[in-house]
Amino acid sequence: MKNTILILFTAFIALLGFFGMSAEALADPKADPLAGPNPDADPEAINLKAIAALVKKLLG
């Protein structure tokens, strides 16, 4: 049961990261992808990305 919950949680975090990056790309399609995130493009997408990174860091 614990492994199932861990797998589902990891999949959820991965989807958050994927859709967060997609939303950021849609909000600012002409931005240089190597320049990093644009804080003016879509702050909510950047926050989801930051939350996903924090959870990944906490889980190891």
Curated annotation (Swiss-Prot):
AXPX repeat locations: 27-30, 31-34, 35-38, 41-44
Family note: Belongs to the MCD family. Mastoparan subfamily.
Protein name: Mastoparan-VT6
Keywords carried by this UniProt record: Amidation, Antibiotic, Antimicrobial, Fungicide, Immunity, Innate immunity, Repeat, Secreted, Signal
Modified residues annotated as Leucine amide in this record: 59
Domain of life the protein comes from: Eukaryota
Function recorded in the entry: The synthetic peptide shows antimicrobial activities against Gram-negative bacteria (but not against all strains tested), Gram-positive bacteria (all strains tested) and the fungi C.albicans and C.parapsilosis. Exhibits little hemolytic activity against washed human erythrocytes.
Membrane-spanning ranges: none
Localisation: Secreted
Chief location: secreted
Signal peptide positions on this chain: 1-27
Propeptide section residues: 28-45
